[in-house]
Amino acid sequence: MPRVKRGTKRRAKRKKILERASGYYLTKSKLYRSAKESVERALKFAYTGRKQKKRQYRSIWIVRIGAAAKLNGLSYSRFISGLKKAGVELDRKMLSEIAIHDPQAFAVLAEQAKAAQPAAA
């Protein structure tokens, strides 16, 4: 069995890491070990960032819907509860888009939510 020295494989592996680290500061873009640590860390942050992005968008939508609901005399929770009872099946993303781009349509939705709420005791 011939001996394998991995010359090309190792070079390709190092080159891939150093290419990913291009633009990093000082030795993090030049030295393999530092670059590898930085790239791994960056990939970990990127992974968690992709998860956080979904949470952040949802919270932005909720803030927008809450602000628009306040303008129509409802709290966010009463607005969402009223829509569920009225059978309106719009997700928060669409509701926030409607609140921004079509306030009249949002007012109609708010009226539907108010009508579906039981009378306050």
Curated annotation (Swiss-Prot):
<keyword id="KW-0694">RNA-binding</keyword>
<keyword id="KW-0687">Ribonucleoprotein</keyword>
<dbReference type="InterPro" id="IPR005813">
    <property type="entry name" value="Ribosomal_bL20"/>
</dbReference>
<comment type="function">
    <text>Binds directly to 23S ribosomal RNA and is necessary for the in vitro assembly process of the 50S ribosomal subunit. It is not involved in the protein synthesizing functions of that subunit.</text>
</comment>
<comment type="similarity">
    <text>Belongs to the bacterial ribosomal protein bL20 family.</text>
</comment>
<keyword id="KW-0689">Ribosomal protein</keyword>
<dbReference type="GO" id="GO:0003735">
    <property type="term" value="F:structural constituent of ribosome"/>
</dbReference>
<keyword id="KW-0699">rRNA-binding</keyword>
<dbReference type="InterPro" id="IPR035566">
    <property type="entry name" value="Ribosomal_protein_bL20_C"/>
</dbReference>
<dbReference type="GO" id="GO:1990904">
    <property type="term" value="C:ribonucleoprotein complex"/>
</dbReference>
<dbReference type="GO" id="GO:0005840">
    <property type="term" value="C:ribosome"/>
</dbReference>
<dbReference type="GO" id="GO:0006412">
    <property type="term" value="P:translation"/>
</dbReference>
<dbReference type="Pfam" id="PF00453">
    <property type="entry name" value="Ribosomal_L20"/>
</dbReference>
<protein>
    <recommendedName>
        <fullName>Large ribosomal subunit protein bL20</fullName>
    </recommendedName>
</protein>
<dbReference type="GO" id="GO:0000027">
    <property type="term" value="P:ribosomal large subunit assembly"/>
</dbReference>
<dbReference type="GO" id="GO:0019843">
    <property type="term" value="F:rRNA binding"/>
</dbReference>
